[in-house]
Regions:
Chain A
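A short, flexible loop at the N-terminus of ABC-type nucleotide-binding domains that lies
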Residues: 1-4, 13-26
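Conserved ABC transporter NBD signature motif
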Residues: 63-75
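Catalytic Walker B motif of ABC-type/P-loop ATPase nucleotide-binding domains
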Residues: 159-162
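Conserved ABC ATPase "signature" region
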Residues: 106, 111-130, 182
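Helix-to-loop junction immediately C-terminal to a conserved catalytic motif
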Residues: 55
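Conserved signature/switch motifs of ABC ATPase nucleotide-binding domains
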Residues: 133-136, 154
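The feature captures the beta-strand-to-loop junction immediately N-terminal to the Walker
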Residues: 40-42
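Short helical segment in ABC ATPase nucleotide-binding domains corresponding to the A-loop/adjacent helical element
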Residues: 95-105, 115, 119, 223
Length: 311, 252
């Protein structure tokens, strides 16, 4: 299977009044076709910047972003995007909001066909019957569902989501995770999900990428070795618990906290979960002082991180 | 619905009654202050002049406002999309807006001698484009980037993004400004009509009332202006309901 998304050696800095602000430095990411990649990292580390690079809304200063084997230089119609703010257009009905991308991507598609496609999706996310409503008449969770439908209506090969469930309450959020899982089972797309919720990343992700603090590099990659048809209960399973602990430790490292982690990786990672660990970032760190950029992780990287690489 | 009509009508009746009472109680003759009961005669006598005057005032106001909308939208778009343009144009605009427009009457009259219609439309335009330009500029420049990105990430052109998202999204601000602009344009038209010798429109009718010491006629013109102003304002409100009605939140 080829990597649908391949990012290598990406560096990027914003030009600000106070001089260049390096945001990404040494970002590596590869997502095989059809896989779900969850990205976590400290706030302000450059996650949204990463989504904009993948979507072709910006070009990196250095390195390359490839989508479907081709280098990304400008936006592509095979991408769908969803944000924390559902950004529905208040002057359009829910149905017409969902149809919007088709007006750009398939201007000659007959209206009936567009409507049929939109209704199919709205039905899948449980919004059947709400087609004619205005966005302001819907709850936050329902708006986010509509936003997901809009992101998927033109059958993109990549869905990019930037903290889409971040503003929702816990139970609504868990409902949406399940909706997301069901959508994936029905539609084929590769997914990049930015989140600050570790449970979300483990529930939805096939892999979880931990970014370091700014400037972000790929600090850690966790392969989530759980069955495809997950239920919320799986988060209370020991394997998921171990992964959550491990991710928590990685986040602590990414934040550059010096206080020692409450758990050491070794007693928390019995066989099964540890098998799936790969960590390119850690591998580079382990390579000694050979030019790897200084990240906060180097000082405090615990056994857990390097051990995964050694396997 | 009944309340919506009954309340303003009652307020109007009360206002007219108080006016009549005030004039009657003070025993003012009609060359000091006309009373509402003097007005019907004026309307009856000069009805033809009122109709032509109102028409002239109306079309010149609307023409000036239409120019203001076109120019204001254009300027607003330029300021909304380019920071440099915004920084450069803003002080100019504010300065221009600060000039008392009465001073422009002689300037315009000298620039375009004898072009009374043109001068009037120009004044209505000059006085009213500012709020439109500013509100459209601010509306566009404060558009959240995500709104742009949902279409930009599909490779949509700037124009498509403007047409499908930025423009409709700024319509509520635009109509807010248009309500201010329509009143300003109306004032601009009347200003020129009243100040110019040989003017036309309701303003000229007012002037002739003044030169002939026909005070009831002057008051009748003022009332006619108020009615026309209200009609123009509510025409904009009706347009707003059609094009930006979605922005109205149901009141709970
Ligand atoms: N357009 C921009 N210009 C300058 N700085 C920016 C811009 N966008 C984001 N930044 C800065 O870059 C850093 C990373 O931003 P972002 O990618 O949004 O982080 P995250 O999504 O991980 O919170 C932040 O410190 C932010 O303030
Ligand atoms: Mg962000």
């Amino acid at each position: 299977m080829t990597d649908l998304i391949a990012i290598s050696g990406v560096r990027h800095a914003y030009r600000t009044k106070a001089g260049p602000l390096p945001v990404l430095d040494g970002l590596e990411l590869s997502v095989p076709e059809g896989r779900f990649c969850a990205v976590v990292g400290p706030s302000g580390c450059g996650k949204s910047t990463l989504t904009r690079l993948i979507a072709g809304l910006m070009k990196p200063d250095q390195g390359e972003v490839r989508l479907e084997g081709r280098r990304v230089t400008s936006p592509r119609r095979t991408v769908g995007m969803a944000f924390q703010n559902p950004v529905l257009l208040e002057w359009r009905s829910i149905l017409d909001n969902v149809i919007l991308p088709l007006e750009i991507v398939a201007p000659r598609m007959p209206r009936a066909e567009r409507v049929a496609r939109a209704e199919e999706l709205l039905d899948m996310v449980g919004l059947a019957g709400f087609e004619g409503k205005r966005p302001s008449e819907l709850s936050g969770g329902m708006r986010q569902r509509a936003s997901l439908c809009r992101a998927l209506v033109h059958r993109p090969s990549v869905l990019i989501m930037d903290e889409p469930f971040g503003a929702l309450d816990n139970f609504t959020r868990e409902d949406l995770w399940q909706t997301m899982r069901d959508l994936r089972a029905r539609e084929r797309f590769t997914c990049v999900l930015i989140t600050h919720d570790l449970r979300e990343s483990v529930f939805l992700g096939d892999q979880v990428v931990v970014l370091s603090g700014r400037p972000a590099r790929t600090q850690y990659v966790l392969d989530v070795d759980l069955p495809e048809d997950r239920t919320i209960d799986i988060l209370y399973d020991r394997r998921a618990g171990d992964m959550l602990h491990l991710l928590r430790d990685q986040i602590r490292i990414a934040q550059g906290r010096d206080d020692p982690p409450a758990h050491t990786g070794s007693d928390l990672l019995p066989g099964s979960a540890a098998q799936g660990l790969t960590t390119p970032g850690a591998a580079r760190d382990a390579g000694g002082p050979g030019g790897a950029p200084d990240g906060p992780a180097r000082k405090t990287a615990p056994d857990g991180a390097t051990r995964g690489a050694a396997r | 619905m009944i309340r919506k009509v009954a309340v303003p009508v009652a307020a109007l009746a009360l206002f007219v009654a108080l006016w009549e009472l005030l004039v009657w109680a003070n025993g003012w003759p009609d060359y000091v202050m006309a009373s509402p009961s003097d007005l019907p005669q004026s309307y009856a006598r000069f009805w033809g002049l009122f109709l032509t005057g109102a028409w002239q005032t109306l079309w010149r106001t609307v023409a000036g406002l239409a120019l203001a909308v076109l120019f204001g939208l254009l300027l607003g778009m330029i300021m909304g999309f380019s920071r440099t343009a915004r920084d450069g144009l803003y002080p100019l605009l504010v300065g221009f807006n600060a000039i008392p427009k009465a001073t422009l009457v002689p300037v315009l009259a000298l620039l375009f001698i004898g072009q009374h219609d043109f001068n009037t439309v120009m004044m209505a335009f000059l006085i009213s484009f500012f709020p439109i330009a500013v509100s459209v500029g601010i509306g566009l420049s404060t558009l959240e980037p995500e709104y742009r990105d949902i279409l930009r990430s599909l490779g949509a052109s700037r124009f498509t993004i403007f047409r499908k998202i930025a423009l409709p999204k700024t319509l509520p601000e635009f109509f807010g400004a248009l309500k201010v602009a329509v009143t300003l344009a109306f004032i601009g038209t009347n200003l020129v009509e009243i100040v110019s010798p040989h003017g036309r429109g309701l303003g000229a009718l007012f002037l002739s009332g003044q030169t002939n010491s026909n005070y009831p006629l002057m008051f009748a013109v003022l009332i006619a202006l108020a009615v026309l102003g209200i009609a123009l304002y509510y025409a904009v409100v009706a347009l707003e309901k059609v094009f930006a009605g979605w922005a109205e939140r149901p009141q709970g």
